Amino acid sequence: SKVKDTIIYLVRHAETVDENGIRNTNEDSQMINEKEILSVEGEEQAKKLSKNNELKNLDIIWSSSYTRAKATAKYIAYENNLIFNLDNNLSERKLGNLKELGKFMKDKSTRDPSQEQLLDRNYKTSDGESAEDTRKRMNIFLNRILKEYEENKIAVVSHRGSDKILFIKLV
């Protein structure tokens, strides 16, 4: 009999809201990043995405634990009558100390830290993550689900930065 394929749909979370208002909170930049919510358009985007035929009849759904990823995954889960599972290995790359990152970026032409970290894959701030760190944990996740969910149809909701790092190694 024919062996069924394992299919993984890698989904980037929907659009987020710009939070440029006054912030009288004691949240650090990492906490702010993790709690970022979808915009009204992002909610609509996620709802529309969840109705995509490719994402029908899924066997399992995995998501980053960041709020924006879970907010995207909930629609896909609802349409498939499934719960979604969380894995920290799917988190966005941790930028870490923003002052250090600013120093690293000051003479760079791209103004895009994730782009620069792809060129210097081991660079990281004192409490941040390098592209290589991110690639390793994304691979841990991918290898595990390929083993545990063979012949399944899987949706994985993650982030542009970490997805980009994963794809560079896959290609």
Question: What are the functions of these language-model segments?
Answer:
Residues S1-I7, N52, L82-L86, E92-D107, ...:
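Acidic, low-complexity terminal tails and accessory targeting/binding regions
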Residues N20-G21, T72-A73, G96, I165-I168:
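Short glycine-/acidic-enriched loop or helix-start segments at secondary-structure transitions
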